[in-house]
Amino acid sequence: MPPEDEWEEPDPDSLMRSERKHEWISEPRYKRMFDDIEHALQGVMGKGPFEWVDRRVFDQVFDRSTLLALHKLMEKGEIETIDHPIARGKEAHVFRATSANGPLAVKIFHTTNAVFKGLTKYIDGDPRFSGLSRRHRELVNIWVRKEFRNLKRMRRGGLRVPEPLLNQKNVLVMEFVGDEEAPSPRLKDIEVEDPAGVFEELLGIMAVIWQTCDLVHADFSEYNILSKDGELWVIDAGQAVTTRHPSAREFLVRDVTRLTEWARRKGHSAEVADSLGRVLDGPLPEL
């Protein structure tokens, strides 16, 4: 989470643009819907205890389509409140949320972000999503369903990934990985006492993804691994493709290369060719 001093006070013009952008909220057909869920969004409107949250987060993430999707999830009782952001990226913000059964992670994908145009290479060639529309909003919804299915497949393979619970338009609801205080830290942000052991475990995870799940993560790095109670969890599986994808091996080589580079930075000797061979057809770890 970025420090509070990275955020500047918005100028009056930007506030006026923000107001105009959300004028639709005052329309009668939407006002009742927004009134129903406004209390559940206090934490992401800068009115909760997390002071670094400001109106720009709301503007960037909570457009009409997203609010309608959240309203539907709240009507069904799947979500009670959206509490505060826990991660953000080019494609999505992730929020801690609360349900009747405890904390959740809610990943909201940006519906107006042009970066998705560069992600079609992870969809084109995936037989699970052939023949579907490539218009931007549909592309975002495809991406959400893709991450949902990839996480399901990885869990069936015995891997520790957040359990995907449901998706609605551009909103993905998942198991929250962390404790009552905070999400679990990324591998990037912790002190690794046994780099060789962690490397071997991650290589085994990568082998299970390839051999058992018939997938390539395609963005496997220290940024997308969480550490919880000494166990490693894989996250951000939206870009994962099947092993039948025409670029699957290219993505796998990239993943293995990143992992070996991480190991070397930590002082452990690792070679790409040997590591790649072990992922492709080496023995699998006991999970």
Protein language model annotation of sequence segments:
Residues 84, 164, 219-220, 273:
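Residue-level detector of family-conserved "landmark" positions at structurally sensitive sites
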Residues 110, 178, 222, 227, ...:
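Short, glycine/acidic-enriched loop or turn micro-motifs at the edges of active sites
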Residues 7-84:
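Juxta-kinase regulatory segment immediately upstream of eukaryotic protein kinase catalytic domains
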Residues 2-3, 197-198, 210-217, 228-287:
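C-lobe/activation-segment region of protein kinase-like
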Residues 170, 224, 278-280:
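A glycine-rich phosphate-binding loop feature that marks nucleotide/adenosyl-phosphate handling sites
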Residues 135-161, 167-168, 184-218, 223, ...:
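Conserved kinase catalytic-core helix
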Residues 120, 184-189, 244-246:
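Short acidic, glycine/proline-rich loop/turn micro-motifs
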Residues 50, 57-183:
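Conserved ATP-binding subdomain of kinase catalytic cores across diverse folds
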